[in-house]
Design a protein with these regions (language model features):
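Amphipathic alpha-helical segments enriched in hydrophobic/aromatic residues interleaved with Lys/Arg
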Residues: 2-18, 118-175, 179-180, 187, ...
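Conserved hydrophobic/aromatic pocket- or pore-lining residues that grip, position, or stack substrates
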Residues: 60, 176, 209, 233
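Terminal helix-turn-helix DNA-binding modules in bacterial transcription factors
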Residues: 207-228, 238-258
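N-terminal regulatory/effector-sensing and dimerization cores
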Residues: 32-129
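A ubiquitous short alpha-helical element
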Residues: 51, 135-143, 193, 221
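Short, hydrophobic secondary-structure boundary micro-motifs
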Residues: 35, 188-192, 218
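N-terminal, Lys/Arg-enriched amphipathic/low-complexity engagement segments
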Residues: 9-47
Length: 258
């Protein structure tokens, strides 16, 4: 038993090294490095940072090395080379790079999640139903596996053969979505993608509020977008974002002002 665990850990470390090498090869500039694959960006950072306000969109960020802190409504999440960050909704957060240097830069892969692709995977795969809870925040940190790391490495390696991107990139992205959905954090993503349930309807209200943050907030109007009562929406909204709709709007306005 212990031997199997040791072999699994060794395999994860080996694939993570390959992912770090792939990211480093294609992320030559500091900060964000857009790629020829739609929705895929690679990051290289060499210094710690102060807290920065930013808005996460539905996405998965896989870390190969370095360390980062995320603050969502007073709840802290820490990401390092053994983890991935899942954001299933549009949400304002504070982020801070904790560990990064010239010798060991923070290297990560950002992939925007395409909800039609998520629904496509859900319709074809026999995945277990998630336990829906208001404690299922829209942001979560999970542990990377050989399967997830390997799929991410293969997606980045497509950049070396651009002619393969149109055919293979979608297939590999479907695998990445599948790996996330099979993880303990997958229920969060499934709940958002599944039409009709409270999380999906709340996400619709969140998207509307982000698009209309400059307007005065009227809870009755927002509740109508979500097709639920005001008190239910308030409860669900706080469950996903760790803040009220008004606090969410203020965070968006603050970020825009900066």
């Amino acid at each position: 038993m212990q031997g199997n665990v040791a072999r699994q850990r060794a395999a994860v470390i080996e694939v993570r090294k390959q992912l770090a090498s792939d990211i480093a090869a294609h992320a030559q500039s500091l900060g964000e490095n857009p790629t020829a694959i739609p929705g895929l960006a690679l990051y290289r950072l060499t210094t710690p940072t102060a807290c920065l306000l930013t808005t996460y969109e539905p996405s998965v960020t896989v870390f190969a090395q370095g360390r980062k802190r995320i603050n969502l409504g007073g709840i802290e999440y820490f990401c390092d080379g053994s983890s991935f960050l899942l954001s299933s909704i549009d949400v304002p957060v504070e982020s801070q790079i904790l560990e990064a240097s010239e010798q060991v830069p923070l290297l990560s892969m950002f992939l925007r999640l395409d909800m039609p692709t998520v629904r496509e995977v859900l319709s074809r795969e026999d995945l277990p139903e998630p336990e829906i809870s208001v404690q299922n925040r829209g942001v979560a940190v999970g542990e990377t596996t050989v399967g997830l790391l390997g799929a991410c490495a293969r997606l980045i390696e497509l950049l070396e053969t651009p002619e393969d991107i149109p055919f293979l990139s979608h297939l590999i992205q479907r695998e990445i979505v599948y790996r996330i959905l099979r993880s303990p954090q997958g229920g969060r993503l499934r709940a958002i993608a599944t039409a009709g349930n409270l999380s999906h309807r709340t996400a619709r209200a969140i998207a509307w509020l982000r698009a209309n943050y400059a307007k005065p907030l009227r809870m009755e109007e927002l509740a109508a977008v979500a097709r639920m009562g005001v008190s239910t929406l308030h409860h669900q909204f706080r469950g996903l974002t760790a803040m009220s709709p008004l606090q969410y709007q203020k965070q968006l306005r603050l970020q825009t002002a900066r």
